């Protein structure tokens, strides 16, 4: 099995509309759906929800 099959690189985009993104990996076996995480958006200086971008 290749390295990127189970844990692909994904982008997390801010829902605040600032365009800020985080880049991370996710385990497809444990999280098959799009993930959402609350992270810090430095553009608006607040914690907001980031959603997986495809």
UniProtKB/Swiss-Prot annotation:
List, in alphabetical order, the GO biological process terms annotated in this UniProt record.
translation
| UniProt keyword list | Ribonucleoprotein, Ribosomal protein
Q: Which GO terms describe its molecular function?
A: structural constituent of ribosome
CC per GO annotation: cytosolic large ribosomal subunit
What InterPro entries is this protein classified in?
Ribosomal_bL33, Ribosomal_bL33_CS, Ribosomal_bL33_sf, Ribosomal_zn-bd
Q: Which domain of life is it from?
A: Bacteria
Membrane-crossing residues? none
SUPFAM superfamilies found in the cross-reference section: Zn-binding ribosomal proteins
Q: Which HAMAP family match?
A: Ribosomal_bL33
What family is reported?
A: Belongs to the bacterial ribosomal protein bL33 family.
What is this protein identified as?
A: Large ribosomal subunit protein bL33
This protein's encoding gene: rpmG
């Amino acid at each position: 099995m290749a390295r990127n099959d189970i844990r692909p690189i994904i982008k997390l985009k801010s829902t605040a509309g600032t365009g800020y993104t985080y880049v991370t990996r996710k385990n497809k076996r444990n999280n098959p759906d799009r993930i959402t995480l609350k992270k810090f958006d430095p553009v608006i200086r607040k914690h907001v929800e980031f959603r997986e971008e495809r």
